[in-house]
Amino acid sequence: GCVTRCFLGDGEFALTPLFYNPAAIDVDEKSRVWVAEAVNYRQWNGRNPGKHFDAGDRVVIVSDEDGDGIAETSKVFVQDPDLIAPLGIAVIGNKVYVSCSPHLLVYTDKDGDDRPDSKEVLYTGFGGRDHDHGLHSVVAGPDGGLWFAVGNAGPHVVTAKDGWTLRSGSLYRDGGPKAADNQPGLRSSDGQVWTGGLVLRGDAQGR
């Protein structure tokens, strides 16, 4: 089988079976490593056979309990049918932001038990579902905003909670069987025609 390793600093920090097929990581204030797994990545039409999670992909928390620089434990924070190969994660306070086209999801742990008490779709409408050209990394910016990147597997038609709508497409057509028909020339609320990959800024309220 395939063994996945994670290196932080000068040596090997963790390896399978603490996690499988990591697509993105973040580190919280307790120095724990949060891993967004993409085990179920592109398994349609017999592609990528092997391990599969029927209940959806996972976010796991990997910990070095004794401070020796090597992780000993992991726990599942969330496993969700809406998670199909998530490609980005940001842990900000008690909120965990996960990029997984068509959604940017927010899981909130209100009681500190390392399990989500609520789930919110902060933004939706990104193309590239189950595709590596979809919604990618999400990070907290120094301005207090959320910054994230999306690839060219559109179309992306995303309406923020203040009504502003991003519309972006391109000539790229290899979006897989779950993709909508991509098209260039879409005009956003700002009057601009955005195309290809994008870097976007939003906020924790979905505006």
Q: How would you describe each model-predicted region?
A:
Residues 1-207:
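Beta-propeller blade termini and top-face loops
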